[in-house]
């Protein structure tokens, strides 16, 4: 959910919240690793106005909640997300009114530039070169149990630039075991680089996580692979793959940075979904359990 922020009539940004909800519609309650495409995963909404000028769009509201199994829970969650956005908007407006828009926005840009400078300084300490991890593997795509999925990872360092290249990884699959490039893969790459070079606990200075860090890390994943699938491939079960990428980045840089890298994890996440229908309420109950 995103709420626009205006100060003195000028649009200066958004307050936004991303969160998990119990059910998003689709062909199966809660979790569906075996979904054939995005349409089997959920109802798709592209930038629609739930509220406009403070007034609820009742038709859209009805469509959203008529297409999920847990209406009561989802309605509460979405209203909480909206309230968080409104609070963020109000506080940002108050900040701008206190210090002026110019001061607040210039400070925000400087904050991002600071993070970029700090990360570039750490990247520059790594000897130039291409660091390649051994091939990583994922068990299967949740349907074709005898087909393992290849994960290739190379990290190139050149001056204060860094590129993570997944060329050679497994082709996209006909289940939910693909990874959205922008929404999941990039985040994993940013996390891997930050946790090695600017660890929040061990690094001596506080460096905020923001776009200044994100804009430095280049990521290559050829279209049509599990890390950059074509529309409308399903992407619900994307977790183990992104963890494997993080492990591979750490492994690739371990020789150059032995004191800043750790042993990897199992690149596994156990995600169980339980559900049933309550006749007395006329709604599903859904319980999700996540263990890493």
What residue ranges belong to the model's regions?
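Glycine/proline-enriched, intrinsically flexible loops and inter-domain linkers
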Residues: 1-292
């Amino acid at each position: 959910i995103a709420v626009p922020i205006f100060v003195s009539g000028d649009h200066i940004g958004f307050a936004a919240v991303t969160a998990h909800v119990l059910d998003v519609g689709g062909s199966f309650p809660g979790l569906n690793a075996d979904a054939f495409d995005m349409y089997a995963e959920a109802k798709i909404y592209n930038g629609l106005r739930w509220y406009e000028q403070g007034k609820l769009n009742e038709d859209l509201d009805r469509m959203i909640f008529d297409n999920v199994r847990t209406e009561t829970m989802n309605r509460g969650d979405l209203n909480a997300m909206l309230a968080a956005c409104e609070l963020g908007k109000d506080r940002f407006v108050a900040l701008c009114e206190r210090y002026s828009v110019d001061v607040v926005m210039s400070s925000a840009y400087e904050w991002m530039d600071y993070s970029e400078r700090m990360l570039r300084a750490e990247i520059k300490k790594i000897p130039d070169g291409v660091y390649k991890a051994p091939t990583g593997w994922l068990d299967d795509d949740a349907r074709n149990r005898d087909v393992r999925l290849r994960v290739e990872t190379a990290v190139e360092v050149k001056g204060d630039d860094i590129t993570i290249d997944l060329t050679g990884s497994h082709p996209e699959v006909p289940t939910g075991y693909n990874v959205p490039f922008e929404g999941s893969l990039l985040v994993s790459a940013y996390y891997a680089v930050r946790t090695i070079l600017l660890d929040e606990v061990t690094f001596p200075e506080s460096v905020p996580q923001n776009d200044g860090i994100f804009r430095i890390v280049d990521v290559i994943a050829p279209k049509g692979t599990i890390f950059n699938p074509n529309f409308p491939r399903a992407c619900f079960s994307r977790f183990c793959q992104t963890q494997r990428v993080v492990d591979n980045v750490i492994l690739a840089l371990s020789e150059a940075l032995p004191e800043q890298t750790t042993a990897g994890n199992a690149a596994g996440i156990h995600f169980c979904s339980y559900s049933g229908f309550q006749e007395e309420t006329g709604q599903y109950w859904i319980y999700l359990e996540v263990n890493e």
